[in-house]
Amino acid sequence: MLTEIRNCNIPKMKRYDHLFEKICDIENLRKAHKNAKKGKGWYKEVQEIDKDPDKYLEQIQEMLINHTYRTSEYEVFYKDDGRKKRKIYKLPYFPDRICQWAILQVIEPCIINNLTTDTYSAIPDRGIHKALHKMQDAMWNHPEECKYCLKLDARHYYQSINHDLLKEKYSRMFNDSELVWLLTEIIDSIQTADIEDLTAIYLLEEDVDPETGIPIGNYLSQYSGNFYFSSFDHWIKEQKHIRYYFRYMDDIVIFAKTKEELVELRKEIDVYFRDELKLNIKGNWQVFPTF
């Protein structure tokens, strides 16, 4: 019988407040410009802003404080990563990329503090190599408990992230209406892209709901994508008591003693994905022996 998911007693998320004023602080904006322009000094936009940085940064500050900031139109292009073509969304350097850096410089510690130690994507000092090392360490040092592996990921993950649910998650973490306004503006900004291009995208993506999706390429998106899964991480670790669990964005690996327990767990994960995250498991999930 599947576990009751909605009534599970997951610890309350820590809430943070008074962050918007830190984002708008001119020193934070100066730092954001410094970080955002790394490796991009040849950009015409960067060179223009560098002639009088504070003039432009004060414009961003005014947009934020007055709530007149609106996400610019996206440039959409395709990138072949060797397995498939991915749609990448690119925003102008000014004001958008500076703005997103200013946000992440303040909220990144809050997001990371909410994640378990079992997730490795978009986190400083973790990454794919550390994830692989941890998996290898588990298999070699605890072979009896890691005889079988469940491997799965979400179908069309970035395209399927539900806007309302993501905004709700941020609202639970940030007791700051102005910060929530700013995050909402960026989360919903995919609707400001070219309508014809969006229509083509959704036709290509079959049953992708046009009310969902965050843009691959946005600096904020990689953190939002990681944060969206945080409740699942806590459920797996604290309610299901899964010891050998590893997540890199939506790619999930779980080790266990028997095939049967992983098959049963996969059924429960399927329910959690649908009911709590509004996602679907991709059809190529596997359970297989590790040795």
Describe each PLM feature range.
Residues 36-47, 79-90, 114-118:
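Glycine-/proline-rich flexible loop or hinge segments
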